[in-house]
Amino acid sequence: MGISRYIITTRPEGKFKPMATECISIKNVPLTKIIKTGRQEEIIQDIIKNKPNAVVLTSSIGASEFFKYYYKYTEDPDIIAIGNNTADEIKKYRANVSVPTIRNSYGVIALLKKYLNSTIALFRSSESNNIINDWLEKNNINFREYHIYSVVKIESSEIKDLFLDTNCIGILLTSSMEARIFHDILSGIEITKNIYAIGNVTDETLRSYGYNVSFTGNSDFESIVKYIDSKNC
């Protein structure tokens, strides 16, 4: 017998992987898609010139693209992953990776404090938040930011009906961009269901629209889904 109650997740196309749950099912409805930029010669030349001592990777997609195109041009830098999923992708290519205790941008910053006199490279999306960048600039730390993929909005004709269905217990939004899209789609409708967020920036974006956020997790999609599942048994 299937599970009728469900949570909506909004992982981008290509990033969602089905996972086992006990008490609710998962319906993933992407609101964005990832566009990879491929090998960029200007990035390669900049890496060779600047020789980063530390590399920050904030997504599994970014990690995959980094190792596919750019890692060979570095000189064995330390690598920091924002969360477990990103770290798992990195470990396909090398064993040593640092993961912050608090798996978000502020946790990454805590690890970067030992690289004050180093060159740091950020490999990420063109839509990433500026929390890490702002801290690096404020502390006059030499860093380079490389955009190796982008995230664009896609039209969803089903998310509104799925969210308003009585079997839906709520939604898990994984980025501030998804939060903005969700607000545009549901604007003017009173929300009484649970809204969950991944990351402080997503949480802050939702609250800026007047939504109550039931729970905010760090950069670990599977862990927060398991938490939501356990709370609905």
Task: Identify the residue ranges that each predicted region occupies.
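Signature of uroporphyrinogen-III synthase
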Residues: M1-C233
